[in-house]
Design a protein with these regions (language model features):
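Conserved mixed alpha/beta core segments that line enzyme active sites in large multi-domain catalysts
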Residues: 1-383
Length: 383
């Protein structure tokens, strides 16, 4: 109870395990993470905390976790876990709580564009809680060493179509709601318009002018607000890009290999402090030479099934014997959940045979938004 009094804010309950932080085959996002609202009734808050700790431990045995362990040749007996309690970064706006921004950064980028280099790193950035990025939402992707070059905002059509429109916040009203194994049971998925009402978007958005058919950097009355982070990335109202570059550089140097970090920040500063970035987590990335090599095998056309001059990334897999293809004509948001179930059945068959396959289809794989892609999870595609 004294811990609650000292923190005075919502608490994140998350795992820290041997397999998650392994230098040889790390994985993240497999186990559950819960957020507990700050309540006046500390005994009720303690009950929620105890339930959350039990649920995080129990998530080791969920189907998603077991499927991932099987796919990576790990066994539950090898796993050891501690629980971390972290203050949730954010600001309370009436009955909801969320940070100005959250994101994931990687010190190595397998998909550089133009004059970017793999070692320049890459960041996925979004308004609100980081769950939006983990769930495959439309985050803003950029290299911290090239903050002026953001592909998603390079044209008007891309900016209106491929930028963030939703975000997650913690519901501060649901302390008495029955606890659930769904770690998002007390989270709200809101529209960016809701954040506009909170007056929390000033530095993160630009304004679309439908009359002149252009996007103006900055927040102006009227017009659709487009999440571009232009004031921060291009106009340097807050030195986020350089901060993230330093974090990735230091993390890679100290861990002796590429790293992935999670971070969040508040731009509601006090006094002369414009804002604060919080380093939430760091883990190693396993890098393979094949994934960075620019050399592509020159195969004759008669031995080539699919070829592209605009593909991103590199990789070599020599143990694939099947192709599963989802036809573009079948891609409909109303049908994508059913397609995910069918893929799960196919995946189960290949898992039992101990055979691997390539999965090809339209849209964004693994997105929680079925209008963007087929919402598969690890148990669906573990082979």
């Amino acid at each position: 109870l004294a811990f609650f009094d000292v923190v005075g804010k919502p608490i994140a309950v998350r795992s820290s395990s041997l397999l998650e932080d392994s230098h040889y085959q790390p994985f993240a996002g497999i186990y559950s993470t819960y957020m507990i609202s700050s309540l006046d009734d500390k005994n009720e808050m303690l009950r929620l905390l105890l339930d959350a700790i039990k649920a995080v431990y129990a998530s080791v045995f969920y189907a998603d976790s077991k499927a991932y362990m099987t796919a990576t040749s790990n066994v539950i007996d090898q796993e050891k876990m501690a629980i971390i309690l972290q203050e949730v970064v954010g600001t309370q706006y009436n009955d909801r709580y969320y940070p100005s921004f959250a994101g994931v950064g990687r010190s190595i980028n397998y998909y550089p564009i133009n004059d970017e280099k793999a070692e320049d790193g890459v960041v996925d950035l979004a308004i609100g809680l980081g769950k939006y990025i983990v769930d495959g939402g439309r985050s803003l992707r950029f290299s911290p060493r090239h903050p002026n070059k953001v592909l998603q905002t390079s044209t008007l059509d891309l900016a209106l179509r491929d930028t963030q429109t939703r975000f997650y916040a913690l519901d501060m009203n649901r302390g008495e709601k029955p606890f659930s194994i769904d770690d998002g049971f007390n989270l709200l998925k809101l529209s960016v318009r809701d954040a506009e009402k909170d007056n929390s978007l000033r530095l993160m958005v630009s304004t679309y002018d439908p009359v002149d058919q252009m996007i103006r950097d900055g927040y102006y009355d009227g017009g659709r607000k487009v999440v571009t982070f232009a004031n921060i990335l291009q106009h340097k109202a807050f030195p986020l890009a350089s901060i993230l570059d330093s974090m990735l550089t230091i993390g890679s140097r100290e861990m002796g290999r590429p790293v992935e970090i999670e971070f969040a920040g508040n731009l509601v500063g006090s006094g002369n402090t414009p804002g604060t970035v919080y380093w939430l987590q760091i883990r190693p990335i396993v890098d393979m030479k094949e994934m960075l090599s620019d050399e592509v095998m020159d195969l004759p056309d008669e031995r080539t099934i699919l070829k592209s001059n605009t593909a991103l990334g590199h990789g070599v897999m020599d143990n694939v014997s099947h192709i599963v293809y989802v036809k573009s004509s079948s891609f409909k948001s109303s049908n994508n959940v059913n397609i995910a179930r069918e893929i799960e059945k196919i995946n189960r068959t290949f898992t039992e045979r101990e055979e691997n396959y390539i999965l090809v289809g339209p849209g964004r794989w693994g997105s929680s938004d079925s209008s963007l892609g087929i919402p598969v999870k690890w148990p669906h595609i573990s082979s």
